[in-house]
């Protein structure tokens, strides 16, 4: 059994004594996820005041939008955010020590006749966050929501014709980047259902929505055109090799003044290999400036350390069962940021490490961080992750890391990890709490 200290350095424990919860569902969500959240804030160097603020926001404004607490066999809304349909995921920028989390807003109407495709809760969630954080602007939120998610008539068409028989129905999610005491809000759109309803591909819907936006905000046109040219060349060559095709999967933007907001287009790469990563990074050889090549050297180093298996892969159509141990590998992912008045889009590549050994991934990341001047995070990272799941056999786990992302700008690497966030810390902390991921637990907690 782990002898690690309680995650959160006391902030989680103190708030747990203070908080009242309107339902047992929200109480379970708090005790399942807040220990890891608190520990991440502490390890990333947030002041104790900022830790209290962000955890309080999480309890008050986020947990009410997470829906029923997931247990095996219980009917619930499944979110594309994680492979087992959990609607919440913590992430950590290891090089900037910035904590983030993403969630798909859910409420009691989600999945019912009143809102079969979960279109509405995100509106209420955004409005609540806009009341407590200055600078949130909803212009681009409204634009992309109209362009990429179902309207009422389209939703009715899908239900009446039973066109939607697949499990994956997520249309949008929100993410908060926590910056000292404040947060920056981002939105992500998945137009898969819109594609089924309209007959237009997800790829077309995403690129068409950005094209129309660029007619009004022409400063993003150079980068957008460069991306279009690259994707067109790749997809034309897919007639010879089908695995070379790039498919747009989702889009995100910052919910701030449109004059400052960034648009990011996410593409799925079916070929998992170093040459494929290099092609994504350089836009097929079009980005060859000194900074790009410095970043490419680090990308190659990270690839070597992580030892991601190669192959031609497709994304699964359904979800894993809650508590199921993964035996799969996923395609790679890349996003391109369209900066204003920049002739080239900026890449961020994602290593899909879900299903790989978490101890080995932690060791690889530690080495990378040590080599590049992030000794403090290198020292803390593995300990933090082990302490977040103290009753598990850490050496055997293979589902804590879902993604490792990498970008390079202003002459430094940006490395982030996306982490399984469920039943963390000393779970269960309340009697008769469910235990879902128990395959690698070190002890029987039934008497504790």
Curated annotation (Swiss-Prot):
GO biological process: ergot alkaloid biosynthetic process
Function summary: Catalyzes the first step of ergot alkaloid biosynthesis. Ergot alkaloids, which are produced by endophyte fungi, can enhance plant host fitness, but also cause livestock toxicosis to host plants.
Catalytic reactions of this protein: L-tryptophan + dimethylallyl diphosphate = 4-(3-methylbut-2-enyl)-L-tryptophan + diphosphate
Name of the protein in question: Tryptophan dimethylallyltransferase 2
CDD domains given in the database record: PT-DMATS_CymD
The keyword Zinc appears for this protein: no
Domain of life: Eukaryota
Family that this chain belongs to: Belongs to the tryptophan dimethylallyltransferase family.
Keywords recorded for this protein, A-Z: Alkaloid metabolism, Transferase
Entry EC no(s): 2.5.1.34
Annotated GO MF terms: tryptophan dimethylallyltransferase activity
UniProt subunit comment: Homodimer.
Class of this enzyme: transferase
Binding site for substrate: 100, 186, 188, 262, 264, 266, 348, 350, 414, 418
Keyword Transferase: yes
Pathway in which this enzyme or protein is active: Alkaloid biosynthesis; ergot alkaloid biosynthesis
Annotated residues for binding of L-tryptophan: 80-81, 89, 190, 249
Annotated source species: Claviceps purpurea (strain 20.1)
């Amino acid at each position: 059994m782990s002898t690690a200290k309680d995650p959160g350095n006391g902030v989680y424990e103190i708030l747990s004594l203070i908080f009242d919860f309107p339902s047992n569902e929200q109480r379970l969500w708090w005790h399942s996820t807040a220990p890891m959240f608190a520990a991440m804030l502490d390890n990333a160097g947030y002041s104790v005041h900022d830790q209290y603020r962000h955890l309080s926001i999480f309890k008050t404004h986020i947990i009410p939008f997470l829906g029923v607490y997931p247990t095996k066999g219980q009917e619930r809304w499944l979110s594309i955010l994680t492979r087992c349909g959990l609607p919440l995921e913590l992430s950590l920028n290891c090089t900037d020590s910035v904590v983030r989390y993403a969630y798909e807003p859910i409420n009691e109407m989600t999945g019912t006749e009143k809102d079969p495709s979960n279109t509405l809760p995100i509106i209420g969630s955004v409005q609540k966050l806009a009341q407590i954080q200055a600078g949130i602007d909803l212009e681009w939120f409204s634009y992309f929501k109209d362009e990429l998610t179902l309207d009422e008539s389209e939703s009715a068409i899908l239900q009446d014709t039973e066109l939607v028989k697949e499990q994956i129905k997520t249309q949008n999610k929100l993410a908060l980047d926590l910056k000292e005491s404040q947060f920056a809000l981002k939105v992500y759109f998945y137009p898969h259902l819109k594609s089924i309803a309209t007959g237009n591909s997800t790829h077309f819907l995403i690129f068409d929505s950005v094209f129309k936006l660029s007619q009004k905000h022409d400063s993003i046109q150079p980068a957008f055109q460069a991306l279009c040219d690259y994707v067109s060349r790749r997809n034309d060559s897919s007639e010879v090799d089908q695995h070379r095709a790039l498919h747009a999967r989702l889009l995100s933007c910052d919910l701030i003044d449109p004059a400052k907001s960034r648009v990011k287009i996410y593409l799925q790469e079916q070929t998992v290999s170093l040459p494929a990563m290099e092609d994504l990074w350089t836009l097929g050889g079009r980005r060859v400036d000194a900074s790009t090549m410095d970043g490419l050297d680090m990308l190659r180093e990270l690839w070597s350390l992580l030892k991601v298996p190669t192959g031609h892969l497709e994304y699964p159509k359904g979800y894993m069962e809650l508590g199921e141990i993964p035996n799969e590998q996923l395609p790679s992912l890349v996003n391109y940021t369209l900066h204003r008045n920049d002739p080239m889009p900026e890449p961020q590549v994602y290593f899909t490490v879900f299903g790989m050994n978490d101890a080995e991934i932690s060791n690889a990341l530690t080495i990378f961080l040590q080599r590049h001047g992030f000794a403090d995070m290198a020292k803390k990272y593995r300990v933090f992750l082990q302490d977040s799941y103290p009753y598990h056999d850490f050496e055997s786990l293979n589902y804590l890391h879902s993604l490792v992302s990498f970008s390079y700008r202003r002459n430094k690497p940006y490395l982030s990890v996306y982490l399984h966030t469920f039943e963390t810390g000393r779970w269960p902390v309340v009697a008769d709490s469910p235990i879902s991921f128990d395959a690698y637990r070190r002890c029987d907690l039934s008497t504790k």
